């Protein structure tokens, strides 16, 4: 038990580099009674089957397409409720024949509920917030040939710090999850750096985002890439991102060495 507690605090406080993203675009709405919805199309490909730090089966790939539906309601500037529900459009992975061969998954994933609590600050030349986020994972994914989502109850905590100046954005976030059955403890941490711009009576930001995923079965993945956020007209918001696995180690036989593309559209009211 003490080892598990140490792993949790070690991952949460020593890996400050998100899954930490919340609707809408991790930014809005900030006003009392505000709400919004966001859809995200995610396409992920992984090229090899890994074990520890080596390729166990080269060319055994996995391809996943997911549609995420997310919503947020702001009771008060400092208190929000968020919900995230993924739907696996199609997923396909290649395994050795003695481990199932080609397998597929499709359907609803697990629901994630969160209660982000924020403390805002305004300083000379910059403004931002600290966030503390309790989270709950609700199992909704059914049985298939294999499961993209865990189909287990889970509880988590998230911490983040963010600020922006007239031109620049910084976001630091980390979250940790404990599952109630067989899944290992996992954490997701993020470091995002951005440059804000105005063009054609709109505004947005160009970002470089670095993520680190850790599981206490020995799995570690470092991925990074560019993102573009565009505030179209205050009501509609667009985001495009791409990330590449620069370092991937799997503690159990699993796919890795991949790329992830996401296209997000959000509406704020």
PLM feature segments, named:
Residues 20-172, 176-179, 188-219, 223-230, ...:
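Transmembrane beta-barrel domains of Gram-negative outer membranes and organellar outer membranes
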Residues 182:
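Active-site rim beta-loop-alpha module in soluble metabolic enzymes
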Residues 1-28:
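Cleavable N-terminal export/targeting peptides
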């Amino acid at each position: 038990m003490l080892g598990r507690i140490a792993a949790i605090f070690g991952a949460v406080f020593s890996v400050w580099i998100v899954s930490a993203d919340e609707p809408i675009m991790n930014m809005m709405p900030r006003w009392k009674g505000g709400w919004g919805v966001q859809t995200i199309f995610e396409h992920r490909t992984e090229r090899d089957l890994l074990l520890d730090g080596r390729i166990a089966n080269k060319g055994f790939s996995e391809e996943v397409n997911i549609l995420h539906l997310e919503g947020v309601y702001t009771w008060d500037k400092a208190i929000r409720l968020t919900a995230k529900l993924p739907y696996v459009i199609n997923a396909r992975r290649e395994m050795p024949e003695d481990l199932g061969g080609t397998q597929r998954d499709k359907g609803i994933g697990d629901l994630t509920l969160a209660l982000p609590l924020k403390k805002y600050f305004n300083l000379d030349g910059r403004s931002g917030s600290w966030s503390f986020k309790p989270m709950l994972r609700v199992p909704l994914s059914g049985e298939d040939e294999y499961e993209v989502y865990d189909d287990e109850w889970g509880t988590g905590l998230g911490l983040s710090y963010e600020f922006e100046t007239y031109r620049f954005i910084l976001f630091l976030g980390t979250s940790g999850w404990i599952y109630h059955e067989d899944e290992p403890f996992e954490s997701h941490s993020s470091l995002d750096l951005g440059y804000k711009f105005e063009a054609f009576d709109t505004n947005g930001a160009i970002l470089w985002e670095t993520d680190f995923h850790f599981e206490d079965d020995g799995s570690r993945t470092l991925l990074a890439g560019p993102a573009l956020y565009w505030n179209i007209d205050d009501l509609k918001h667009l985001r495009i991102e791409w990330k590449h696995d620069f370092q991937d180690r799997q503690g159990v036989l699993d796919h890795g060495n991949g790329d992830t593309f996401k296209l997000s559209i959000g509406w704020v009211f």
